[in-house]
């Protein structure tokens, strides 16, 4: 019997603004997030997964964000305001 690896997801924030031309999502964090983490964006029936490759707070590059921070990350696909963001472990 082959064991299937179960990936854990933890809600870490919500998209509060999306810049469609730049493809940047601003996330209000409810948990920690750092460069290299894998995140999943979920909005209605659509979802996608991507690694966090860059992050900014107040237009300054940062390596991590904590609860209550508003961080901007570049996204690979279109998302929407109010999308829920999960960190995948």
Per-region residue spans from a language model:
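Beta-strand/loop-dominated core regions that host nucleotide or nucleotide-derived cofactor-binding catalytic loops
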Residues: 2-29, 33-89
